[in-house]
């Protein structure tokens, strides 16, 4: 579970960034929206504490491709003053284009690196 502590009302988004999916043209959709999703759609948080998932209908799992031994990825958490429509999967360029259109005073972001290793 991921815990979010909010001091203000905000719209919260959670993404997984997998740089290994990027090809030389940057065409691959390596940003995947984890939250909000079909099972947990309410991403408007008032001041307070929240957990994702907010219910026990799903888990956030880390996996490797069949041919991978390990990978380094990133969780990107965004807190925004206004709601933004993010697609389920985006290229690095598309994600950054949307993000650059949001003023710094209207967003907070956290980047959480992690590794997944085969046992």
Label each PLM-derived region with a short phrase:
Residues 1-119:
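Secretory-pathway glycoprotein ectodomains that are cysteine- and/or Ser/Thr/Pro-rich
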């Amino acid at each position: 579970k991921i815990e979010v502590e909010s001091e203000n009302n905000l719209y919260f988004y959670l993404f997984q960034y997998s740089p290994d999916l990027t090809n030389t043209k940057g065409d691959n959709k390596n940003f995947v929206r984890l939250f909000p999703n079909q099972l947990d759609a309410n991403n408007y948080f008032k001041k307070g504490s929240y957990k994702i998932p907010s219910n026990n209908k799903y888990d956030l799992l880390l996996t490797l491709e069949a041919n991978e031994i390990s990978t380094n990825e990133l969780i990107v958490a965004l807190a925004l003053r206004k709601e933004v429509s993010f697609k389920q999967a985006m290229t690095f360029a598309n994600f950054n284009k949307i993000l650059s259109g949001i003023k710094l005073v209207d967003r907070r972001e956290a980047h959480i690196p992690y590794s997944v290793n085969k046992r």
